[in-house]
């Protein structure tokens, strides 16, 4: 059983699908990016959970699920207290802010811009990355999620996913 299949088993087939641009997904697939930064996080799922990556059609993207990973944990970064003072003064970053910048491949200015209105950013820890190729309808989706959404897979779906992993 792969870690992805284990994550699906832990959550009785419940998983998450994210929409992600080609440039960021390439960094995940290559192992360069180990933290996916989002303004929200799933609360109704247990760790580890499976994350399927829908590559958007922007900039020549595939427009289908082309990757998956296991999320073992989610870190939090308060941009107002964890980034703001450092961004303004150019001081050394705190441990969590440094981790977000180093592992997400996002510089401090972009991170601050992304999170300064909501305040809190969530860093989804990426592990066990797998390449696969699935159309959205195979995961019972009619359209790509705006950011992310839950999906529920049955035993046949999980078997199809396992067969699609390269």
Model-derived features: where do they sit?
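Structured alpha/beta reader/binder surfaces that contact nucleic acids or chromatin modification marks
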Residues: 2-166
């Amino acid at each position: 059983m792969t870690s992805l299949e284990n994550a699906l088993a832990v959550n009785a087939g419940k998983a998450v699908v994210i929409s992600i641009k080609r440039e960021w997904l390439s960094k995940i697939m290559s192992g360069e990016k180990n933290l996916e930064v989002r303004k929200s996080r799933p609360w109704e799922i247990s760790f580890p959970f499976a994350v399927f990556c829908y590559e958007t059609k922007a900039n020549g993207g595939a427009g289908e699920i082309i990757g998956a990973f296991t999320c073992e944990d989610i870190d939090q970064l308060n941009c107002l207290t964890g980034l703001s003072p450092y961004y303004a003064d150019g001081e050394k970053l705190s441990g969590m802010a440094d981790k977000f910048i180093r592992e997400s491949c996002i510089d401090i200015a972009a991170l601050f811009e992304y999170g300064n209105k909501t305040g809190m950013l969530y860093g989804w820890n990426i592990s066990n990355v797998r390449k696969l190729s699935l159309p959205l309808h195979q995961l019972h989706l009619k359209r790509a999620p705006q950011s992310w959404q839950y999906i529920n897979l049955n035993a046949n779906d999980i078997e199809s996913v396992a067969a699609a992993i390269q």
